[in-house]
A protein has these predicted regions:
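Long, low-complexity intrinsically disordered regions
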Residues: 1-294, 298-300, 305-378
């Protein structure tokens, strides 16, 4: 498999090319989890993998708890579908607690404090209450904890990892910005919250779904993405192949096995796979800098054609422009007259490759504007 085929197959596996997902939920189920610390852009990561989901569609799924936002895996904020969160949280939590141990000690969160903090937060969100971070801080402080700054963040993360709390319905601040809330894990997840999987079964599911949605990729890519050990990923991969030997194939590149779904393999141009109309200018995609097309890989991220996330201009964060699956520039958006009936979106676009033509960029900007549901220019 050459570099062009790797890039094309990744685009297809990640549903950045047809066949696209029917909904944002389906896109998320394919990817299992996506990095989501920048909420509006994470919503776009899901929307652009569908046949037409809008920001409002994704926002409704988040508000209703079908898509949940929480800390797990490396750890950082992730979107996870509520049917996957129970087993993925149970698999990930011990590794994250281990990684957090030094910070727990530094912030005074020993075993007793952590258990009591979990109890305080569980009581705070009981009965269907959705509370902001500031409200959770007030509850912890009322119980005698010095819960601010880093300590507050780790009390909340501890409760997330233990299946006590998870994202609630976002609320709008006075400025119009959406703000995270927290709710009871069991109430948001539902019956699946009480159905844990054996670890081996979870590892097999993790490996099968990671390599199907991000292949071709390496064991190290999966280990770094998931926070699991290389040994656990190898075990999960072996179990997944034992259960379904035809689900994944491998190819060796520079002596390293890359695993992928054979039904998604793309030998043709990554811009326009066989069956699509070919555009000599190439296909442009606007992806967020934490998109899974970037963050889903570590050892083999070089196929992106540049380093991501992108912070190229005066230290200001920018997102990634792809030309046929390879980095070709950077972008960010600005909402003008937010909250008004005449709000519009203006993109700051920096193209690095002279061969990029405006038609492809016009199409990409139009897709983004359709997702936002507002006029969008650059």
């Amino acid at each position: 498999m050459d570099a062009e085929a790797v890039v094309g197959t990744r685009l297809a596996s990640q549903q950045l090319r047809a066949p696209l997902a029917a909904s944002a939920e389906d896109a998320l189920k394919n990817l299992l989890a996506i990095q989501a610390q920048e909420y509006p852009y994470a919503c776009w990561s899901l929307g652009q993998r569908t046949a037409g989901a809008t920001a409002d569609d994704v926002g409704q799924a988040v508000a209703e708890g079908r898509i949940l936002r929480t800390h797990l895996l490396r750890p950082t904020w992730h979107f996870v579908h509520r049917t996957d969160l129970p087993w993925l949280r149970a698999l990930s939590a011990p590794r994250v607690h281990q990684a957090n141990a030094a910070t727990y000690r530094r912030t005074g969160i020993d075993a007793a404090a952590a258990a009591r903090g979990d109890g305080v937060l569980a009581a705070a969100v009981a009965g269907g209450r959705h509370l902001s971070r500031e409200q959770l801080a007030s509850e912890l402080q009322h119980a005698g904890f010095a819960a601010s700054g880093l300590a507050l963040a780790y009390f909340i993360m501890h409760a997330e990892l233990n299946g006590v709390i998870v994202s609630g319905a976002p609320v709008r601040s006075a400025s119009g910005a959406l703000r995270q809330t927290y709710a009871a894990f069991g109430e948001r997840v539902g019956p699946a919250a009480t159905t844990p999987l054996p670890k081996d079964e979870s590892l097999a599911a993790l490996a099968a779904r990671y390599f199907r949605s991000r292949g071709p990729a390496t064991v190290k890519d999966c280990a770094d993405w998931s926070g699991m050990t290389m040994a656990d990923v190898r075990l999960g991969l072996a179990l997944a192949l034992e259960d379904n030997p035809a689900a994944l194939e491998s190819t060796e590149i520079d002596g390293v096995p890359f695993y992928f779904s054979p039904e998604l393999a793309q030998p043709s141009s990554p811009g326009f796979p066989a069956g699509d109309e070919t555009d000599p200018a190439g296909r442009i995609d606007l992806i967020q800098c934490y998109d899974e097309y970037v963050m889903g890989y570590s050892a083999s991220r070089g196929y992106l054609g540049g380093k991501g996330p992108v912070f190229p201009y005066n230290g200001d964060p920018m997102h990634v422009i792809l030309l046929d699956g390879r980095m070709a520039g950077a972008w960010r958006h600005r909402i003008l007259r937010p909250g008004s009936r005449g709000q519009t979106c203006e993109l700051d676009v920096r193209i690095w490759q002279d061969k990029t033509q405006s038609a492809g960029l016009d199409d990409a900007v139009a897709r983004y504007g359709a997702f936002l549901g507002m006029p969008t220019t650059y």
